[in-house]
């Protein structure tokens, strides 16, 4: 799981999180797909992380986004699985939107985001979690 600062390409996005907390599902050097857990309420984040630690991916589809590596501002903070329980409760989500014809970004409340995510909460991506050649031994063993 990673934390980072992100400046989205906003042409098609109604809003985005400037400080995502992302479980990466697929990656290439130019982009990656991942589940931003900030789109979920803290209580639902706990359930998602519990499943991840059990070796299961069970994530609402609306949390999954494409991130361009060229739009990351700074470094990716790689979080060990032992830190996930703490990281999901940090109140660092910052949703913003751009308004056509206006300069700057406008805040978009997390409560509105959570409400929208709740509407499609049961449309989920499910898979077995696989860790290859990375992480601690127990993470790799758990995923087998």
Describe each model-derived feature in a short phrase.
Residues 1-13:
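Short coil-to-beta transition motif at edge beta-strands of beta-rich domains
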Residues 2-4, 21, 31, 37, ...:
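Intrinsically disordered, low-complexity segments enriched in small/polar residues
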Residues 12-51:
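Basic/aromatic-rich interaction segments and small domains that mediate binding to polyanionic partners
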Residues 40-144:
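Intrinsically disordered, low-complexity, charged/polar segments
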